[in-house]
């Protein structure tokens, strides 16, 4: 039987996830949260580690002599020193397509909040405010239409491309910056550019990249 350690559980609603398939694979220890300095002691002689946001440094990894696999329960794996893992022969895996549609949807929801101020006007109506006698509406902010405006997307990967498709459906033009350019996306409604050029004409910017890109 394998020895498995889950260093930090991703946020979940009570009873939402069934961990029994994981527990069936071996002796499993769960932690809700693990500070970086406690990681090595908690991993101990475990062969398999699962984590969400716990930081695993080279110093920590070198203390874990029996470690064979690190499974990141997320898309980003920048909290793990992958260069050190490669040196030590530790396999690192992640969930590359996790939540791509949901994250794009959330980005669009935030954008529409900026343009339409739905939350503000909802709160005002709940306070009892109305447009007044003879008027069926009111607004404290002008509605900003997205049609014809330009959006800047930094990081045109899985999430960035889904977001771009939605923005194009609104009639927006797309400027994108990415270290790895996809020729199939270079067209009249989307073009790649450098960061300085991207910032100049855009109305809205969507960031889908690690902090190191900037």
Descriptions of predicted regions:
Residues 159:
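Hydrophobic/small residue at the entry helix of a nucleotide-binding pocket
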Residues 206-214:
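Single conserved hydrophobic/aromatic residue that forms the stacking wall/gate
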Residues 88, 96-150, 165:
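Phosphate-binding beta-alpha-beta segment of Rossmann-like dinucleotide-binding domains, i.e.
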Residues 34-42, 187-202:
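Short acidic low-complexity segments
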Residues 156:
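Glycine-rich Rossmann-fold phosphate-binding loop(s) that bind the pyrophosphate
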Residues 32, 73-74, 91-101:
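Short beta->alpha connector loops at strand-helix junctions that form conserved
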Residues 170-186:
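NAD(P)-binding Rossmann-fold cofactor-contacting core
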Residues 1-46, 171, 175:
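N-terminal glycine-/charge-rich "phosphate-binding" loop or analogous flexible N-terminal tail
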């Amino acid at each position: 039987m394998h020895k498995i350690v889950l260093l930090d559980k991703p946020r979940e609603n009570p009873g939402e996830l069934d961990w029994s398939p994981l527990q069936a694979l071996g002796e499993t220890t769960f932690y809700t949260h693990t500070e970086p300095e406690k990681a090595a002691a908690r991993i101990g002689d475990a062969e398999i580690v699962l984590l969400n946001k716990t930081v695993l440094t080279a110093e920590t990894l070198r203390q874990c002599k029996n470690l064979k696999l690190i499974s990141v329960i997320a898309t980003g794996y920048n909290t793990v020193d992958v260069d050190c893992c490669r040196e030590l022969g530790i396999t690192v895996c992640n969930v590359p397509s996790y939540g791509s549609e949901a994250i794009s949807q959330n980005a669009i929801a935030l954008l529409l909040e900026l343009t339409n101020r739905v939350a503000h006007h909802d709160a005002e109506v709940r306070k009892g405010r109305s447009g007044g006698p003879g008027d069926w509406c009111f607004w404290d902010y002008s509605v900003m239409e997205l049609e014809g405006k330009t959006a800047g997307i930094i990081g045109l990967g899985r999430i960035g491309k889904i977001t771009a498709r939605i923005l194009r459906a609104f009639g927006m033009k797309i400027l994108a910056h990415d270290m790895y350019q996809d020729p199939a996306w270079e067209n009249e409604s989307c073009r790649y550019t450098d960061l300085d050029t991207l910032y100049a004409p855009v109305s809205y910017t969507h960031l889908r990249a690690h902090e190191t890109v900037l």
